[in-house]
Structure formats: structure tokens, C-alpha cells
Amino acid sequence: MNEDLLEKVYQENLEERIISFLAEKERISLEEAMDIYYNSKLATMIHKGEYGIQYLDYKVLVEILLETEPELMQRS
């Protein structure tokens, strides 16, 4: 496997963990959690690999999402 493929697989697994933990923590459906995550600035930062944020623990990333983008929770 090349490095780009490994990074893509890692990112997909990270997104799954973020969405699952967000749904569990906020007691919302997986669909709602997906909508929140994929409409967040955090998702964009992770996708672009900005600041190495994608290497933080998924639980920390969920806390960052909840603290920095609370307006997304109003949508669910």
C-alpha cells in the first residue's frame, strides 16, 4: 500500500468513529450525526489535512466540534 491510500483508509475510519461517537454522546441518530459532521468546518479541515488535526483522538475531535460549532447541533 502506498502512503496516500493508507491516509485515505485512516481518514475513513476516523470519520466513522467521529460520527458514531457523536451520535452516542448526543443521543442522536447516525444520520443526524453524519449530517452534522459532514456540514462542519472540522470535516473540511480533516479532509484537507489542515494542521495535522486528523491525528487527534476521535473523542477529542468530537469535543472540538461541539465546542467550536454549536450551531450545527441546533439543526438536528
Language-model regions, residue ranges each:
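C-terminal alpha-helical interaction appendages
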Residues: 1-76
